[in-house]
């Protein structure tokens, strides 16, 4: 059997293609409350940095806003910017957390990535942030 896949690769982009500048916010009118906001999508996709094969995941973004909410269309564009980025699953979830915490400055945020199976192993990553004082 020949290894005709050995040299096969798909286009893989670097982290510079992650577009956090597309994010927009909406003023949150209830900063004194501890309301939990949750967004769920099963359309997240990035690629393996070594093979270029897709890594598809269900993402849950859960947070307690302080002064800002993320505008959903901008969030969709931000997440879509990962589509051809070569990034490890664990790094993608932490990068999303870092970018959204920097942008929104929430009281609390948790990102859960549930990636489809590879080699019979599914991966679930949970990254959290909690503001010390608010």
From Swiss-Prot:
It is an enzyme of class 1 (oxidoreductase). It is found in: Cytoplasm. The keyword Cell membrane does not apply. GO terms for molecular function: preQ1 synthase activity. The keyword Cytoplasm applies. InterPro entries: GTP-CH-I_C/QueF, NADPH_dep_7-cyano-7-deazaG_red, QueF, QueF_type1. The active site is at 48 (thioimide intermediate), 55 (proton donor). One of its GO terms (cellular component) is cytoplasm. Keywords: Cytoplasm, NADP, Oxidoreductase, Queuosine biosynthesis. It catalyses: 7-aminomethyl-7-carbaguanine + 2 NADP(+) = 7-cyano-7-deazaguanine + 2 NADPH + 3 H(+). Pathway: tRNA modification; tRNA-queuosine biosynthesis. Substrate binds at residues 70-72, 89-90. It comes from the Bacteria. Its EC number is 1.7.1.13. One of its GO terms (biological process) is queuosine biosynthetic process. It holds the Pfam family QueF. PANTHER family: NADPH-DEPENDENT 7-CYANO-7-DEAZAGUANINE REDUCTASE. Belongs to the GTP cyclohydrolase I family. QueF type 1 subfamily. Catalyzes the NADPH-dependent reduction of 7-cyano-7-deazaguanine (preQ0) to 7-aminomethyl-7-deazaguanine (preQ1). This is NADPH-dependent 7-cyano-7-deazaguanine reductase.
